[in-house]
């Protein structure tokens, strides 16, 4: 699926201010999963064949270990998702940036799948 099609699919889920419930990485970063909940639906984004994964946040966000925070008290809500095509070593890949204030996520991968859980 091309970047523009994925972007349209994401926008159809009305992701703005959706609560992120899970971010997971497997196989040394080859696969990344982001799950968000909106309008009583869980939407899963799967990133496969990842060659770049970048997380950044504020120092204040990590003052208290997140494992000590109850899920209901986590406030990671999506502000923006942008999917674009990118070229890396002459290969066309997908680049996705997710603004989950105060966390920013950027993933460059071969495939992005989006579906309801």
Locate each region found by the language model:
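Surface-exposed, interaction-prone regions used to assemble/regulate multi-protein complexes
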Residues: 1-117
């Amino acid at each position: 699926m091309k970047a523009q099609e994925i972007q349209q699919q994401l926008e159809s889920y009305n992701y703005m201010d959706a609560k992120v419930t899970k971010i997971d990485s497997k196989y040394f970063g080859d696969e990344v999963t982001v799950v968000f909940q909106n309008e009583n639906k869980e939407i899963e984004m799967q990133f496969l064949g990842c060659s770049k994964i970048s997380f950044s946040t504020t120092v204040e966000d990590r003052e208290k270990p997140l494992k000590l925070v109850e899920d209901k008290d986590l406030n990671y809500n999506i502000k923006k998702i942008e999917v674009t095509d990118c070229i890396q070593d002459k290969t066309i890949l997908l680049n996705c940036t997710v603004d989950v204030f105060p966390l920013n996520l950027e993933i460059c991968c071969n495939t992005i799948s989006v579906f309801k859980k």
